[in-house]
């Protein structure tokens, strides 16, 4: 028993380092395409609604297939499934970069959503296999840091590459995915798997339990916040191009800078500030503050007329989300007497649902007015805050019954 634990620890130390590098590289590759994706899709002839549906189709495929890949990794191993996800990133990026028709863009995004859904769930399962309970939080934190670092650096690189050629970031992203594949296959040890024997409820049952439980308000907050953010992300490049009169190449560079600034602000908040604020003010106040700050940021974006103010206002909205999401996760974890993993998993499902609905909504209302995605997102966040204060005024806390 002791030798097995020792081997598990050795694999864990080495595996976490390799996994950190792998997630960082693949997320940097994913981040590289973000500043140019909407510009490229518009150059092919996609409408704002179709651009929104591209994001929706990708998120929907990930929502459907992530649990399936996770189950498959329990049976055949973490490395093979993780590798399938990396191949999916590479192939889908290449197809997207070579596309000249809208249906080809959808093919690339749907295929990418199906296959890339194998990556992050398998990485999380790998951490569970190779860390003890007291080290698991640190392992998950490392993965979050790798993702955040990749997302911060990637868009800046993508914006620079996009200034020369809108297809180039997709090919660089594909190359980085293949580099990650080689790195992980050669250096990532296959762990001893510890699949759970507990029967898990279906997603439909999980949603029903969540909406009927004492934490329903915070699951709805997660859904609305993800919806609002996804509606913004699905149209931000179109808005910058139409409002600021940017070309596709100059717009890609400008949006890359915006992403980097927002990423740095969020990293500063998530890197330690949010924990101190939670200890001082509590999760509930921070959730409300984050929702209000994000709503203000969205409304400010509608009045921007240069890239500097767009970056500042987007950073305000990003700061609101950075305050809110960890506060919701902390509150749900603390107020769940058992099965925290299931509760956080349900929270992630609500987040995924918001990311499915938000882009389609953003692309649809963009036709009616380029500021409507942001105004409607701010209204949804404000309504969520209003529900919280209304419940408190009636003496019914949003978490009633949870203690």
Predicted regions and their residues:
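Juxtamembrane intracellular "pre-TM" segments in multi-pass secondary transporters
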Residues: 2-13, 189-220, 403
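Cytoplasmic helix-loop-helix junction between adjacent transmembrane helices
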Residues: 108-148
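Short amphipathic helix-loop junctions that connect adjacent transmembrane helices
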Residues: 35-48, 235-253
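Helix-breaking motifs and short loop linkers at transmembrane-helix boundaries and internal kinks
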Residues: 45, 77, 98-104, 115, ...
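Helix-loop-helix hairpin linking two adjacent transmembrane segments in secondary transporters
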Residues: 143-185
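Conserved MFS/SLC helix-loop-helix module at the cytosolic interface between two early adjacent transmembrane helices
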Residues: 63-100
């Amino acid at each position: 028993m002791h030798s097995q634990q020792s081997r598990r620890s050795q694999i864990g130390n080495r595996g976490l380092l390799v996994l950190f590098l792998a997630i960082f590289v693949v997320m940097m590759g994913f981040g590289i395409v973000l500043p140019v994706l909407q510009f490229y899709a518009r150059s092919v002839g996609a409408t704002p609604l179709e651009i929104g549906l591209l994001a929706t189709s990708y998120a929907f495929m990930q929502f459907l297939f992530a649990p399936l890949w996770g189950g498959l990794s329990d049976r055949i191993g973490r490395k093979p499934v993780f590798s399938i996800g990396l191949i999916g990133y590479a192939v889908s990026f290449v197809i997207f970069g070579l596309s000249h028709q809208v249906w080809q863009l959808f093919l690339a995004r749907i295929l990418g959503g199906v296959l890339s859904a194998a990556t992050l769930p398998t990485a999380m399962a790998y951490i569970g296999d190779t860390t003890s309970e007291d080290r698991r939080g640190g392992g998950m934190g490392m993965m979050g840091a790798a993702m955040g670092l990749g997302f911060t650096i990637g868009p800046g690189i993508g914006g620079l590459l996009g200034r020369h050629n809108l297809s180039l970031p997709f090919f660089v992203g594909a190359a980085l995915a293949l580099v990650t594949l080689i790195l992980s296959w050669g250096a990532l040890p296959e762990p001893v798997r510890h699949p759970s024997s507990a029967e898990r409820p279906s997603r439909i049952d999980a949603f029903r339990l969540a909406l009927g439980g004492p934490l329903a308000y915070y699951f709805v907050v997660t859904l609305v916040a993800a919806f609002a953010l996804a509606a913004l992300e699905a149209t931000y490049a179109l808005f910058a191009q139409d409002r600021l009169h940017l070309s596709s190449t100059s717009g890609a560079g400008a949006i890359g800078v915006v992403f980097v600034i927002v990423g740095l602000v969020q990293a500063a908040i998530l890197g330690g500030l949010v924990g101190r604020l939670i200890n001082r003010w509590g999760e509930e106040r921070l959730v409300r503050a984050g929702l209000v700050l994000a709503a203000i940021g969205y409304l400010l974006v509608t009045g921007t007329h240069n890239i500097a103010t767009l970056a500042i206002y987007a950073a305000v909205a990003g700061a609101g989300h950075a305050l809110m999401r960890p506060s919701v996760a902390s509150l749900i974890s603390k107020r769940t007497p058992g099965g925290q993993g299931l509760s956080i998993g349900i929270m992630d499902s609500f987040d995924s649902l918001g990311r499915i609905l938000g882009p389609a909504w953003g692309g649809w209302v963009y036709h009616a007015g380029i500021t409507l995605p942001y105004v409607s997102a701010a209204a949804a966040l404000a309504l969520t805050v209003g529900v919280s204060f209304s419940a408190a005024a009636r003496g019914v806390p949003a978490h009633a019954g949870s203690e």
